[in-house]
């Protein structure tokens, strides 16, 4: 079994615990370079404390159902792609205006916004979240590198679900990082909080598991960039 496969297996067991306890832990690979050249983040639940889909489901009174389905997928209890398509079907028919209104209502923690704006390294948001959400967040913080799942609208502007050919799943995240960094995964720091981040976290040299409820992303990232955070250093809030 390769080191990447071993890291993926370890993360598979650690992620449900980390989500339950709102913990953060750092897992560098043996191939990790001392100097980090690229930094990337998941979006929902990592950069934002609020998840988009439960907020959209609130418009139809199904927020609790959506929250439970989302948590099951992020903890790895249900397959991500299957769950994402099902959860998206619950939102079909929302107006474009309603979707964008909810997107604009979701804020980033102040320290997270500061972190994204102050990083001097190439920085990207790598997420399976809806592309309009990712684009909106990137515009707010001045980032141009991102990937998200494309969505469709009907001719009269109603939300019509996902483009099945453009869903960003765990493999899609890893593939984006490979291309964006020109293969420099050993010198890349990736931060994520769910099962959809497994492939990316296992592939990069510097993996940080972090849930937004932990509340110290800026401090942890700067510790890693300055080589001050020990491997598998679990912190809880």
Language-model region placement:
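Alpha-helical substrate-recognition element adjacent to the catalytic core
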Residues: 1-21, 25-151, 155
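C-terminal cap/substrate-recognition subdomain and adjoining C-terminal extension
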Residues: 2-13, 103-237
